[in-house]
Regions:
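Rossmann-like NAD(P)(H) cofactor-binding subdomain of soluble oxidoreductases
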Residues: 12, 38-40, 45-132
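NAD(P)+-binding Rossmann beta1-loop-alpha1 motif at the extreme N-terminus of oxidoreductases
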Residues: 1-52
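Rossmann-fold dinucleotide-binding core
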Residues: 98-177, 181
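Active-site-proximal catalytic alpha-helix in oxidoreductases
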Residues: 175-219
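Helix-loop-beta segment of a Rossmann-like dinucleotide-binding subdomain
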Residues: 89, 132-142, 193-203, 252-262
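NAD(P)-dependent Rossmann-like dehydrogenase/reductase catalytic/cofactor-binding core
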Residues: 212-303
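Aromatic pocket-lining residues of Rossmann-like dinucleotide-binding sites
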Residues: 16, 108, 185
């Protein structure tokens, strides 16, 4: 079952559905019912019609012995989705969390009796309409438990995703990888959203100096938290990581900007909140992060 029929949720559900004959094998649960007839458009432009079970009520979800629940909701909606769904599920089935930020992974892992794995992906997708999703670019997914447990489950799920055309690897250091992704998102998303620019424009004046200032704060914080730095041949591994992502995604418009323009809630709390709280605990000043938080908090409160 996939919970959250956004771009990644639908890409995941339809990709998994392609690998089986039974249209009821994969179900897609959301706050509104989508058409059961869906179209998955591949990166090379091929349109594949697929039939899938779509649901609104968790109590209607078919329970299967090999069931896995993938939570692909936005971070701010995930805890509510989990609490609504949990009473209807067998207590030992695996959950997979696909959220940005670092707000829900530990709380849900502590509350669920079964395996809770976290996934981080670079797959690209966007929704055309209620029955059409585009797999815009192939990426890679890593999946694992925060403490490195449930290795066999992680391997099985990675194999299942890879078989569905979504290249995946089971890892033992998913928490470190989530920290790395959090740093990237904390630098890029708020600045792109504030100035309404593409990722690549962060290379230009005056944005590049704000990128550097934010990276200086985050490098100090990651060192204080003893988070292993990403591989690098330079003395500035965190700077290298973020600038590489900016180069690679130069034409992209960050998800936080897309959310703002669509008048949707952003994931600013899940991305900036854990970093600011960790900095406060460590006694580290983060004026750049604080400024981004305040700007997004005002916009969020304005609706």
């Amino acid at each position: 079952m996939v919970v959250g029929p956004g771009a990644i949720g639908r890409l995941l559900a339809l990709s998994l559905q392609r690998t089986v004959q039974d249209s009821a094998a994969v179900s897609l649960l959301g706050r509104r019912t989508l058409p059961e007839q869906q179209c998955l458009e591949t990166p090379d432009g091929k349109r594949i019609p697929l039939r899938i079970t779509t649901l609104m009520e968790p109590s209607h979800a078919p329970i299967r012995p090999d069931m896995v629940v993938h939570l692909t909701t936005k971070s701010w909606a995930t805890m509510n989705a989990f609490e609504t769904l949990a009473p209807h599920l067998p207590v030992d089935i695996p959950l997979v969390l696909w959220q940005n930020g670092f707000r829900v992974q530990h709380p849900i892992s502590n509350r669920w009796m079964g395996p809770v794995l976290c996934a981080s992906t670079t797959e690209g997708a966007y929704v055309v309409d209620d029955s059409h999703v585009v797999h815009a670019g192939r990426g890679h997914t890593v999946i694992g438990h925060l403490n490195g447990h449930y290795r066999e489950v992680a391997v099985q799920l990675a194999e299942q995703l890879s078989h569905a055309g979504l290249a995946a690897t089971a890892v033992d250091d998913i928490e470190v990888r989530l920290w790395h992704k959090l740093v990237v998102n904390a630098v890029i998303n708020p600045l792109v959203a504030r100035f309404r620019i593409t990722n690549g424009q962060l290379r230009d004046t005056p944005y590049s100096s704000l990128v550097e200032a934010t990276l200086d704060e985050l490098s100090t914080l990651m060192q204080a938290l003893k988070v292993p730095a990403p591989p690098s041949t330079s003395l500035y591994p965190w700077h290298d990581l973020v600038w590489q992502v900016i180069e690679r995604t130069a034409a992209n418009r960050a998800s936080m900007l897309q959310d703002l323009e669509a008048n949707r809630p952003t994931e600013y709390d899940a991305i900036l909140g854990p970093l600011r709280e960790a900095a406060q605990t460590a006694g580290i000043a983060t004026p750049q992060l604080d400024s981004r938080w305040q700007e997004l908090e005002v916009r969020n409160n304005q609706g």
